[in-house]
UniProtKB/Swiss-Prot annotation:
Role: Hydrolyzes ribosome-free peptidyl-tRNAs (with 1 or more amino acids incorporated), which drop off the ribosome during protein synthesis, or as a result of ribosome stalling. Catalyzes the release of premature peptidyl moieties from peptidyl-tRNA molecules trapped in stalled 50S ribosomal subunits, and thus maintains levels of free tRNAs and 50S ribosomes.
Lineage of source species: Bacteria, Bacillati, Mycoplasmatota, Mollicutes, Acholeplasmatales
Gene3D superfamilies membership: Peptidyl-tRNA hydrolase
Residues where tRNA binds: F14, Y64, N66, N112
Top enzyme class: hydrolase
Taxonomic source organism: Onion yellows phytoplasma (strain OY-M)
InterPro entries: Pept_tRNA_hydro, Pept_tRNA_hydro_CS, Pept_tRNA_hydro_sf
Cell compartment(s), UniProt: Cytoplasm
Protein name in the entry: Peptidyl-tRNA hydrolase
């Protein structure tokens, strides 16, 4: 079983913020596929999807970004998901808006959601799909990430949403992650 984790913050005031790109991606993927709601409550939203006998879970932790690892750990323990079968979708201020980067593993890069996942799982060995949100040096970082973006920026950040959905589909279908990285990192 695969686990796709879209990082973000719960609540309508965060919907169109840079920090909620992970939630937006999960929502986009679900809107294009048949899925089953397993749970939607104050701690997590869990969705199940099946493609050709490949069962996967997509989740949106509802504990706020900085506590995402609590939910991820609970789910991997409950469903016995291996670390190598986890893909975390996360915003990245060091990438230009809309730029994508797949990583096999790595540190948190200052991202508190990733930091909490690493801390709770005790490993950096999970896969990531980073989506560029750029950085505005004129604004405090938390304000920049948590302020709703205009329609133009939102469109630019998610300009590769069809490619992102293909990456998720291929990940679920067990396409080798090195092939995905080689195929998509060089193009995007």
């Amino acid at each position: 079983m695969k686990l796709i984790v879209g990082l973000g913050n719960p609540g309508t005031k965060f919907v169109n913020t840079r920090h909620n790109v992970g939630f937006a991606v999960v929502d986009s993927f679900l809107s294009q596929n048949k899925y089953q709601i397993l749970k939607e409550d104050k701690t997590d939203h869990i969705y199940q999807i099946n493609f050709n006998h490949h069962q996967s879970l997509l989740i949106k932790p509802q504990t706020y970004m900085n506590l995402s690892g609590e939910v991820v750990k609970k789910i991997i323990n409950k469903y016995r998901i291996k670390i190598e079968n986890i893909l975390v979708i996360v915003d990245d201020i060091y990438l230009d808006e809309g730029k994508l980067k797949l990583k096999m593993q790595g540190g948190h890069g200052g991202h508190n959601g990733l930091r909490n996942i690493i801390d709770r799982l005790g490993t950096k060995q999970f896969k990531r799909l980073k989506i560029g949100v750029s950085l505005d040096s004129c604004m405090p970082l938390d304000q920049y990430l948590l302020t709703p973006v205009n329609a133009s920026s939102q469109k630019n950040i998610l300009k590769n949403i069809n490619i992102i959905n293909k990456i998720i589909f291929n990940f679920i279908q067990d396409v080798d992650f090195n092939i995905l990285m080689n195929g998509y990192n060089s193009k995007l």
